[in-house]
Design a protein with these regions (language model features):
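Surface-exposed amphipathic alpha-helices with a cationic face
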Residues: 162, 185-190
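Adenosine-nucleotide cofactor-binding segment
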Residues: 174-177, 189-224
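Cytochrome P450 core scaffold surrounding the K-helix E-X-X-R motif
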Residues: 43-49
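NAD(P)H dinucleotide-binding glycine-rich loop of Rossmann-like/cofactor-binding domains
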Residues: 96-175
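N-terminal Rossmann-fold NAD(P) dinucleotide-binding loop
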Residues: 181-182
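Phosphate-coordination loops involved in phosphoryl transfer and adenosine-cofactor binding
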Residues: 4, 168-171, 193
């Protein structure tokens, strides 16, 4: 697909603007995805407000965003499992594909992984992205593209629940009702935990936790 696309670019701390760039051409093993939704993560805000997270320092111009969902609009010649029109969620970590961990399906442990919106790798606050087809996951009909964009943070919550061996009949407390706290609460409920309580100091967040299924909430600023 030829043409230009709009890209939201971080031009400095607290400074955003738009650029026009060429729509990327997918390689044989890639698909071109027209992005419909990209979540705004806490790390995006941190980079925007401070210009760095630890040793990862933004060198403008830089593109933020790593929680994308969209529609396949072009398919590389080697891609067989996706077609134009498929709605997909994108894995934001790009891996080598041939190390022992990648071959075992544990590609999150790849020593050469690079991540959308982690300097120096640009993110996806843009209209299109070419991405490895094996890292694009087709969404079922009962999952919207908006929900697909939230699979990345949801996976963090499920990983926490799995690591904690959450199971039927347990009680659990989640400290913090930000995005990750809320999806962790939902993951605990999905794994059968009987009672999940959420602690925060912001009433609006606690209200959202109750709306999403918490069994109870505690305002840490008001209660011991």
């Amino acid at each position: 697909m030829n043409g230009k696309m709009k890209v939201a670019v971080m031009n400095g701390i607290g400074k955003m603007g738009f650029e026009e760039r060429d729509i990327p051409t997918p390689k044989d093993n890639e698909v071109l995805v027209k992005l419909e939704y990209v979540g705004i993560c806490g790390s995006d805000l941190h980079y925007y407000e401070t210009g760095a997270i630890g040793d990862y320092i933004v060198k403008p111009p830089f593109v933020l965003g790593h929680e994308p969902g969209g529609v396949v609009v072009e398919v590389g010649s080697d891609v067989k499992h996706l077609k134009v029109g498929d709605r997909v969620a994108l894995e934001p970590g790009k891996t080598c594909g041939h190390c022992e961990f990648c071959k075992q399906g544990k590609y999150n442990l790849c020593p050469d992984v690079v991540f959308f919106a982690t300097p120096p790798v640009d993110g996806v606050f843009q209209e299109y992205v070419a991405h490895e087809a094996d890292l694009c996951f087709k969404l079922p009909e009962n999952v919207s593209t908006l929900e697909g964009a939230l699979i990345e943070p949801l996976a963090v919550g499920f990983h926490a629940a799995i690591q904690g061996d959450a199971h039927l009949g347990q009680k659990a407390v989640v400290m913090g009702a930000g995005c990750i706290g809320l999806v962790s609460m939902m993951a605990l409920k999905a794994r059968g935990v009987s009672e999940v309580y959420v602690v925060d100091i912001m009433e609006k967040r606690l209200d959202k936790a109750m709306e999403l299924g918490a069994d109870g909430v505690i305002n840490g600023a008001k209660e011991d």
